[in-house]
Amino acid sequence: MADEQQQTLDPQAPEQTDAPEAAKDLTARVQELEEQLAAAQDQSLRLVADLQNVRRRAEQDVEKAHKFALEKFAGDLLAVVDTLERGLQMSNPDDEAIRPMREGMELTLKMFDDTLRRYQVEAINPEGEPFNPEQHQAMVMEESATAEPGSVLKVFQKGYLISGRLLRPAMVVVSKAPSETPPSIDEQA
């Protein structure tokens, strides 16, 4: 009987000694699972952020595609606007024979201008302003005693911006300081 009691105690003895090891194993397993959970949550947040970035990039790409399509179309329409403006400049406003045609051209030009403005296409007419190489294209340099050197004297063709970005530069005449004339023979004597 003493042996049976000892045998019943013996099986419990190893369990008691294994309890601290089992607790360590469970603690290690809990820590491992917590690390895996944290890694999974981090990965989930990264995937959500990546998805938002992909969505934002796709929206920007669509917006850019619309802008570039509009930019090309607006650029093609500028030749029509230029032609209407030149036609109005060349026609005599006092000529009664062409008055109805001139009024029609003015209305058509106004409609074009209104439509361009609606799509953020703005004209650049820099006459009298300082030359800006980012928005102007110098066609001719001309001496001027009255204008500040480097300013726009005349505009050959208006430039245009679309949504604040250059669509077409203005073609301009830029002033330069008058050159000093060499003294004449009479002045040397």
Swiss-Prot record:
CDD domains: GrpE (cd00446). The keyword Chaperone applies. It holds the Pfam family GrpE. Belongs to the GrpE family. Participates actively in the response to hyperosmotic and heat shock by preventing the aggregation of stress-denatured proteins, in association with DnaK and GrpE. It is the nucleotide exchange factor for DnaK and may function as a thermosensor. Unfolded proteins bind initially to DnaJ; upon interaction with the DnaJ-bound protein, DnaK hydrolyzes its bound ATP, resulting in the formation of a stable complex. GrpE releases ADP from DnaK; ATP binding to DnaK triggers the release of the substrate protein, thus completing the reaction cycle. Homodimer. This is Protein GrpE. The lineage of its organism: Bacteria, Pseudomonadati, Pseudomonadota, Gammaproteobacteria, Pseudomonadales.
